[in-house]
Amino acid sequence: MAEDDVRDGETWHQFGFPDPERKEYLALQAERPTEVGPADRRMLLEGFDFLALVSHSCFRIGERPVVVIWRRNGVVDVIVRSADCTVDQRRTLKGAAAEKLLSAVLATHADAWTEPFEPKEPVLDGYSWDMTVYAGSRYFECCGDNAAPREVAELLRAVADAGLPLAWDGEEIAFACANEEGDHE
């Protein structure tokens, strides 16, 4: 990703992202975004400031559902944008509601996802996803094809429980079951 970074005046931009919130977040950083190695991922996840979860489909180029979780100033902003932008909602969470969502982020154990997630029997459906977790100018990425881990589905449910719509792939989440055969929910 670093080769796509540019400095425009005093702002870092990473090209190719559909979420203006990421551009705003990166504009606040004084340093060039730096990807961390596996040893630093857990600490970064526990102290994250910004998380962007994006779904991709080769059949819907340029239309990507986005979930952004931004922790700042003692509150958590959650933004949900559907692929076609018919849903574009933001909610600010405080107290117990914010802690519940932050617990769901930590429960993903995304720090351990160092390889692309692929179900045992993949289907060439053109679907993929990625999640980028930032703490300051440091970040790590997770990604997968066809399906997402059950923990991503649980994170999306936590976003829905916070009162935001589940605007993700037409309200369908593809994820791998415990038996690794794959399923939809």
What is the meaning of each model-derived region?
Residues 3-61, 66, 83-185:
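Short, well-ordered, aromatic-rich surface patches in folded extracellular/luminal domains
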Residues 67-71:
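Conserved beta-hairpin
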Residues 73-83:
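N-terminal glycine/threonine-rich, aromatic-flanked beta-hairpin/loop signature
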